[in-house]
Amino acid sequence: MKIYKLQTPVNAILENIAADKSISHRFAIFSLLTQEENKAQNYLLAQDTLNTLEIIKNLGAKIEQKDSCVKIIPPKEILSPNCILDCGNSGTAMRLMIGFLAGISGFFVLSGDKYLNNRPMRRISKPLTQIGARIYGRNEANLAPLCIEGQKLKAFNFKSEISSAQVKTAMILSAFRADNVCTFSEISLSRNHSENMLKAMKAPIRVSNDDLSLEINPLKKPLKAQNIIIPNDPSSAFYFVLAAIILPKSQIILKNILLNPTRIEAYKILQKMGAKLEMTITQNDFETIGEIRVESSKLNGIEVKDNIAWLIDEAPALAIAFALAKGKSSLINAKELRVKESDRIAVMVENLKLCGVEARELDDGFEIEGGCELKSSKIKSYGDHRIAMSFAILGLLCGIEIDDSDCIKTSFPNFIEILSNLGARIDY
């Protein structure tokens, strides 16, 4: 895919960007904890979340889909399927399903694409094995394909060494099948969509006052079925916010955006850098929803070291903002970036250098010198959708060719369409 330099300003109101991926995954998987029909409007129709629907279908769920409206009727009992459960490129789907299936009677095989099958799963499989789960795979169940032989699980008191919503949710799902009350704690608050959704479903969980600890009781009855409208994904919206900031005389309004406090840290960083950006809450139901207004802005360099778990998906796009800011910027305490869909630290630095930007790898992040003269280049996405989309936005300023852009479809299938509607010229 080739993005050409955009010569005109962007002025738009965007109402139909991609639905939130985290909530879409959880809606599908959590429906298996109910016994009645679950409904979602604005379900994300991307490869990752469609794979999750196929997984729960193979476990016995019945699914009706009309456009982005999805109905799920869970099975009375989870089936032990005669096929591999394909998670595609989604670490969320795989890690949550490991936790869900560990305590379910049956035999299950989880696999994914070549990128997912090289991402670490021991952070889930190890604590589950310690409470009685039987999980088999390469490198001591660290790499998929993974085979799970469901067992009755023992109660646990688990303290996670990393701040990860995927680890937290996997442990919550396993706790529902344990033989007694379980507790989970983390060093800092990760995304809390699971807690929000499960509380709305009347799940037997209790969150501590500081939000860092959970008490989870075994399920004694099915949870309340869901009927929700899924808001738009702030991680997807971030690319167009960045576009409005870096393109002269531009303004964008994005509506129906998820504004959960654990999802807007990157927006707050842009504000600290000088971005003319406003977030307005319009709805507070099981999640906080609102709109974002942003316009062309001059950015200043910044050091980012806190709340990294809240901006891990936006980090590649933030690196683009760093490259266009005045002065030096840095991101640290972000070692988790090395085990995402790609090694995002190495890949961002490599590709920024190709575009004429001074950038340096750190063990747990990167340093970027802003204000360098940009040059058109061909970059490698390494199959990482967030790398591809971040450099597509930079391409609006200098022209960029991306070797593999098909990966964008895993999370944001209409990204190219929206970019084209904003005036971008794209050879695809």
UniProtKB/Swiss-Prot annotation:
PANTHER family: AROM/DEHYDROQUINATE SYNTHASE (PTHR21090), PENTAFUNCTIONAL AROM POLYPEPTIDE (PTHR21090:SF5)
Organism of derivation: Campylobacter jejuni subsp. jejuni serotype O:23/36 (strain 81-176)
Enzyme Commission code: 2.5.1.19
GO molecular function, one term: 3-phosphoshikimate 1-carboxyvinyltransferase activity
Pathway(s) per entry: Metabolic intermediate biosynthesis; chorismate biosynthesis; chorismate from D-erythrose 4-phosphate and phosphoenolpyruvate: step 6/7
Compartments where found: Cytoplasm
Record-listed phosphoenolpyruvate binding positions: K21, G91, R119, Q166, R344, R386
Keywords: Amino-acid biosynthesis, Aromatic amino acid biosynthesis, Cytoplasm, Transferase
Catalytic activity: 3-phosphoshikimate + phosphoenolpyruvate = 5-O-(1-carboxyvinyl)-3-phosphoshikimate + phosphate
UniProt-annotated binding residues for 3-phosphoshikimate: K21, S22, R26, S164, Q166, D313, K340
This protein's GO CC annotations: cytoplasm
Similarity-based family: Belongs to the EPSP synthase family.
Keyword Transferase (UniProt): yes
CDD domains in the cross-refs: EPSP_synthase
Domain of life: Bacteria
Active site: residue positions: D313
Protein name (database record): 3-phosphoshikimate 1-carboxyvinyltransferase
Keyword Isomerase: no
A GO BP annotation: chorismate biosynthetic process
Principal localisation: cytoplasm
